[in-house]
Amino acid sequence: MSTSKRSSHSGKLLSSRVSWHTVRLMLKAAAATIALSSGSVLADFCESDIALIDSNFSGGNLGVCEFTTPTSVSFTITPEDAPPINPSAWYSFRLSPKQNEAIQLSLTFVDGHARYWPKVSTDGATWQRLDDSQVSISEDRSILTITLERRSDPLFISAQELLVNDDYEQWMRSLAAHPEVGSRTLGRSIQGRPIQALITEQKPEVVYLFGRQHPPEITGGLAMQSFVGELFGDSDLANEFRARFMLVLVPLINPDGVDAGHWRHNMGGRDLNRDWGPFTQPEIQSIKRLINEIDEGGIAPKLMLDFHSTQRSRFYTQMPEDFDEEIDFARDWLDRARLRMSDFDFLYDPRKPSGQENTKNYFYSTYHIPAITYEIGDEVDRGDISRTSPIFAQEMMRVMLERE
């Protein structure tokens, strides 16, 4: 039988994490007792005479699962680590019918809430938003109920569509075929997965782009792919931009968390976007070694973009007065983009520097350059992401090329 990926943490665990994992194991043990009489199975699958439900795929996470009746399933979705943790509850599982019966799924989120509207797919590749009539959410958003009509074929149900390690590998391989782009393994994650970078030809100035520090933030990953596609295009603008700036991309910083269906952390129990300063985790350490190497080569950082997702699209930037220049790069860039897509809702959200050890604060405090967190709303239409990301990329390139 399959074993749960949820128990695959490695490395030394802090006492609080041991306690939390003990609680989760107790929940599973309790579910196992029920399973003996109900016919349900836990770990990364459960089943009845009506259907089999499993999460035995990259990005899968169903927490504790049991059939309370042959056609009713209860899920308890818990974070990978004890709070405090961002309450972005992730779930992703596959329902394989054995009989053609309607099924009700009830997801209870522990230390989290129903942040994401469920998406469904018959093949794990093409996704759509589940119809409103099939979903209900409790007033406090702690319980999500899904009613599925009779069906005979398997169905993936997920907080967001899957964008997993294999998808990144294929995408990065296609980008690495560009004559100006090289691929480099910077290091390994806690579970031994490669931390891959794409690097263009060396120039006096460098632009950094990062992604997927937080596993559930799919829309940020989609935006980054479309944005980067424009940077590597064959337009006069893109060619001029690459002729001046070296590009360093690390699109998948947390491959272990993505594979395990985590809410936030890597396998070390750390929010990687709070490790830019301590540099305690191998994923961030590997990137820091590359940054040090580029610094030692005398190449000047000019911009950092870090792609994420949140409830509403926004760009976290520095305050205009944080720079000596007359022109505020971020405002200029975003104003130009807005003129070309006035129908796309996003916020320019300048913030004062803080002590939070994230990518944005690290690059600003270290290099005094524009360092921007590029956030795309969770439920933004995917067609709008594909349409607007290249425009953001074009206007970024124009503004950067105008700067001294």
Where are these regions (language model features)?
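Extended acidic/polar, glycine-enriched regions
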Residues: 139-179
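N-terminal signal peptide c-region/cleavage motif recognized by signal peptidases
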Residues: 38-39
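Sec-dependent signal peptide recognition
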Residues: 24-35
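Active-site-adjacent mobile loop/cap segments within catalytic or ligand-binding domains
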Residues: 162, 273, 315-323, 349, ...
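Leucine-biased recognition of intrinsically disordered, low-complexity hydrophobic segments
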Residues: 13-14, 25-27, 42
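Extreme N-terminal flexible tails
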Residues: 42-144, 151
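Active-site/substrate-binding loop(s) of hydrolase catalytic cores
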Residues: 180-196, 202-347, 369-378
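N-terminal secretory signal peptides that target proteins for export/translocation
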Residues: 1-22
